[in-house]
Structures are given as C-alpha cells and as structure tokens.
UniProtKB/Swiss-Prot annotation:
Class of enzymatic activity (EC top level): transferase
Alphabetized Gene3D superfamilies for the sequence: 3.40.1280.10
Name recorded for this polypeptide: Ribosomal RNA large subunit methyltransferase H
HAMAP family referenced in this protein's UniProt entry, alphabetically: 23SrRNA_methyltr_H
Amino acid sequence: MNVSRCRIIAVGKVRKGWVQEGVELYLKRLPGLTVVELKDSSREKEAEAIRAALRSDELPVMLMEQGTPLASIPFAQRLERLGNERLAFVIGGADGLTDELKAAARWQLSLSPMTFPHELARLLLLEQLFRAQAILQGSPYHRA
C-alpha cells in the first residue's frame, strides 16, 4: 500500500479540537497522504465540488453507511491488492452523498453500520489507513 497514492476528499472542516489533534497525529504518521477539504453546502453543490476534485486517474472510494463493511485485516488486504492504483476516499457532508456519486463509486466502503459526523469519519478513516499500513508492514501496532 502506497499512501502517497491516496487522497481523502472530505466535505466540511474539522471543528472539534480533539478530533483535529487525532487527524494531525495520523497525517504525520502517513506522510504523502493528502486531504482535500471542501466547503459545506447543499448536497448537490457538494457533489459538484467532489466531482471537480476527483482526478480521472483515481479510483473513487465512497464512504457511506450502506457500503461494504470490512474488518481491519481484509481492508489492508484489499488496499494491498489495489497495488499502485490511485485512490480517492470521499467523505460527504452532513446530508451524505448524492445517488449519482454513490453510483459512480468503484468501491463503496462502510466504516460501521452506525452513522458518524463527517469529521469523526475522517479520523476513523485515517486511523484505519495507518492500521492497514502497519498490518502490511508487520508492525506490532495492530494487535487483534
């Protein structure tokens, strides 16, 4: 897994200090990972901004409650199988993603069957990306 080939496209700012601390911690642990932060707006305007932010060479991974849930090891294995594919993990705003964006996803991922605020979803995704990297490198960080 090459995190420099991954981006997170997220609607909304991280407003809670404790969440921002966690985000900064994992971004330091994942050098090369980029976060593109988009402005909160209507769902349709957010979808337009997401489409504009996506690169043509990226595989869009939409984070959504109805997506496929994966435990940490299968998540790491899937990232490893994707090899050098460029990935864009997309986190929608408070109203979620449009049906059009969901349909355009090559991969629909669920972090949990529960719903989280978008800023918390960003932190959870960063931690899971770090954990996936640790699993693939044989690091003792993952102790399941």
